[in-house]
């Protein structure tokens, strides 16, 4: 029997809504990355964008285990000598764009090539509970009920 390989006509993209409130960051990012890649589908083909569109709301209320909220650092370089800078996860979550913590966690779980960049365009992350994608009628995925370890009280 020949191995099934999907064609562009076989790809069917759905919209999935995930509420990140009280969910552990790494576990959320793993679930989202697998959905974006399409690994949850029986027709998964590694070299094609098979994944669904994912909407993550309440990204500012995501949880971290241990001391990661205070100790985890996000580094960047200004391009000047001695220009390495960083912010802690706590500073990012309390700043102007707290959704970037979830974006960066998922981005680092997706392959770093043109296919990965294409898959990341199917992810929308919002800090609050509101999102402008009601017209797409997203199906709700309750990450908290999948595994008791997925959630953590503040």
UniProtKB/Swiss-Prot annotation:
GO-annotated biological processes: negative regulation of translation; translation
GO molecular function: mRNA binding; structural constituent of ribosome
Entry keywords, A to Z: Ribonucleoprotein, Ribosomal protein
Pfam families: Ribosomal_L13
Gene Ontology cellular component list: cytosolic large ribosomal subunit
NCBIfam families xrefs: rplM_bact
Protein name: Large ribosomal subunit protein uL13
């Amino acid at each position: 029997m020949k191995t099934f390989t999907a064609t562009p006509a076989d790809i069917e993209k759905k919209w999935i809504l995930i509420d990140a409130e009280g969910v552990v960051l790494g576990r959320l990012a793993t679930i989202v990355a697998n959905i974006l890649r399409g690994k949850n589908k029986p027709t998964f083909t590694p070299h094609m964008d098979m994944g669904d569109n994912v909407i993550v709301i309440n990204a500012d209320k995501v949880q971290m285990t241990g001391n990661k909220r205070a100790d985890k650092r996000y580094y960047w370089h200004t391009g000047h000598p001695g220009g390495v800078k960083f912010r802690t996860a706590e500073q990012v979550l309390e700043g102007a764009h707290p959704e970037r913590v979830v974006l960066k966690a998922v981005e680092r779980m997706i392959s770093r090539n043109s296919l990965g960049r294409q898959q990341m365009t199917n992810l929308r992350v919002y800090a609050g509970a509101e999102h402008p994608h009601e017209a797409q009628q997203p199906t709700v995925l309750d990450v908290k009920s999948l595994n008791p370890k997925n959630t953590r009280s503040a």
